[in-house]
Regions:
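DUTPase catalytic domain/fold
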Residues: 1-146
Length: 146
């Protein structure tokens, strides 16, 4: 079980994964792949992480590659980041890493390739249409620092 605070915990069912733990000083929790993986360039594979979780109401998880994953293994997470909400919570809802290989690769079971964090869900947002926004112009995409 992972503790969120004094009163909140996460139920976790390990199918084929070492116990997860949050390292001191880190906001993210590393995960381990639950199978040996062999991929060729251009191949897609859902890689099992070997566990399922039941997140508390009002929380979601964000799954992302570790910073070294592409450099070491040449794989990309195809959905950029994964958002796992608390409705994905049954025994059969195994967490997966959707990988795309850019080069031939073999990755051993138990290797850390991704990480996740748990956060509160975004509150309901009411959008208010206006004719003009009051902030000053900052430039276009990728130009605010120029």
């Amino acid at each position: 079980m992972i503790f969120l605070s004094n009163s909140e915990t996460i139920k976790i069912r390990y199918i084929d994964s070492p116990a997860l733990e949050q390292k001191d000083g880190s906001d993210w929790i590393d995960t381990y792949i639950a199978e040996d993986v062999s991929m060729q360039p251009g191949e897609f594979k859902l890689i099992s992480l070997g566990f399922a979780c039941q997140l508390p109401d009002g929380y979601e998880a964000i799954l992302a590659p570790r910073s070294s994953t592409f450099k070491r293994y040449g794989i990309l997470q195809t959905n950029s980041i994964g958002v796992i909400d608390n409705s994905f919570a049954s025994d059969s809802d195994l967490w997966m890493f959707p990988a795309y290989a850019t080069r031939p690769v073999v990755i051993a079971k138990g290797t850390r390739i991704c990480q996740f964090r748990i956060q509160k869900k975004q509150p309901t947002i009411d959008f208010i249409p206006v004719e003009h926004l009051t902030a000053s112009k900052r430039g276009s995409f990728c130009s605010t620092g120029i």
